[in-house]
Amino acid sequence: MQVDRDLDKVGVHCAIKDCNLLDFLPFICQGCQGQFCLEHKEEKEHKCPTPIVKIGGTTVTCDKCESILPVPVNCFEKDILSMHLRKGCPKKTTVNQHKCSFCPKMESIKIVCPNCKNNFCIKHRFERDHKCKPRVNPPLQQTISPHLQNLLSQLRNSKPVKTNS
């Protein structure tokens, strides 16, 4: 039946193979990131390989992606870091995405000069600070197609039309 197949796309099946219960609001384990049903949401219920550190635990920060990783009790930081790197350490995301047109600095906000229309950092945002050279707009005649120019000239040369008002 088509409706049954559509419902499979809405929820997520419990990660426990013997359970495989379809859950519309699954629980995500903070340790292993698996998705589980209500019965298997606890770390001990699904035998979590990387349980989250509760009281008295520590964390370690990955130097490459700056992720904070929990270190379970009776585990070593170096083992957690090496496992994190093996799983595929995500690239560090940068907030600063707008490059200054005058220097190599990046900014988190876009600062566009109204005169030259280039992007700049806070230090070079004023025209005098980035040696602004305004963009020259081409004359209107150059931007209009020849066909449109012909129509405009015909309109200019035509006699006004009288209307009854």
Swiss-Prot record:
Indicate which residues the UniProt annotation says bind Zn(2+) 3.
Answer: 100, 103, 121, 124
One GO CC annotation = cytoplasm
Q: Where does Zn(2+) 2 bind?
A: 29, 32, 46, 48
Do the record's keywords include Zinc? yes
- Would the keyword Oxidoreductase turn up in this protein's UniProt record? no
- What is the disulfide pattern of this chain? none
Instruction: Write out the residues that bind Zn(2+) 1.
Output: 14, 19, 37, 40
UniProt xrefs under Pfam families = zf-AN1 (PF01428)
Which keywords appear in this protein's UniProt record, sorted alphabetically?
Answer: Metal-binding, Repeat, Zinc, Zinc-finger
InterPro entries annotated for this entry?
AN1-like_Znf (IPR035896), Znf_AN1 (IPR000058)
Give binding positions for Zn(2+) 4.
113, 116, 130, 132
For this chain, one GO molecular function annotation is:
zinc ion binding
| Zinc fingers (AN1-type), renumbered ranges | 8-56, 94-140
Q: Give the protein name, as stated in the record.
A: AN1-type zinc finger protein
Task: Tell me the organism.
Answer: Dictyostelium discoideum (Social amoeba)
